[in-house]
Design a protein with these regions (language model features):
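Extracellular/lumenal and peripheral-membrane lipid-interaction modules
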Residues: 16-180
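Bacterial N-terminal signal peptides
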Residues: 4-14
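Electrostatic, structured charged patches in enzyme active sites and in nucleic-acid/phosphate-binding
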Residues: 1
């Protein structure tokens, strides 16, 4: 009887030795749980409001140990008496993922703004200077909110969460594993 228990336990443990999070799962988590709207400046003088409209995550593609977050954003910009301008911005952030064992959450650290364009074209310097603080706040927000969280109600995720796992990037997935 005890041998049967050990066999079943080892099969379960072997199946739970790691948990992978795909790019799509992380993208879906961000869409469902995180929203970004930032504004800077003084309205009717120099003002910008930036809202993220779409996010996509790429894991370990451009840099083996980093996660890239692509954000399509809309920026409404007003400079002095000129009419408001609407800009469709493409942002790319990259960051190192970090797993918090206490909460079962994945956070992004060492965030870098890699790309900052409007439809693939660099922005004029005056507009870039005005919008950059709001864009930086989006990057800051990405570092403060989890980009993925293990679900305590799913057995495999609960078992991984209760241990002290490592986080690695493998095959364009975040892999939370119990053993090196």
């Amino acid at each position: 009887m005890s041998q049967m228990f050990l066999l079943i336990f080892s099969i379960m443990l072997g199946g739970c030795a790691s948990y992978s999070v795909t790019e799509q799962e992380m993208t879906d988590y961000l869409h469902d749980n995180v929203s970004f709207n930032q504004s800077v400046g003084v309205e009717n003088l120099m003002y910008a409001q930036v809202s993220v409209t779409d996010l996509a995550v790429k894991i370990g593609r451009s840099d083996a140990d980093r996660v890239a977050v692509f954000a399509n954003t809309v920026a409404n910009v007003q400079l002095f008496d000129s009419p408001k301008q609407r800009l469709d911005l493409d942002l790319e952030f990259s960051a190192v993922p970090h797993y918090d064992a206490k909460t079962g959450e994945v956070f992004l650290q060492s965030i870098r703004l890699e790309q900052f364009t409007e439809n693939g074209t660099p922005l004029p310097a005056d507009i870039k200077r005005l919008i950059k603080p709001a864009v930086s706040m989006i990057g800051y927000g990405l570092s403060q909110k989890p980009v993925y969280k293990l679900d305590s109600h799913v057995l495999q995720e609960a078992l991984i969460k209760s241990a002290e796992p490592n986080l690695v990037i493998r095959d364009n997935k975040l892999v939370i594993e119990l053993f090196d």
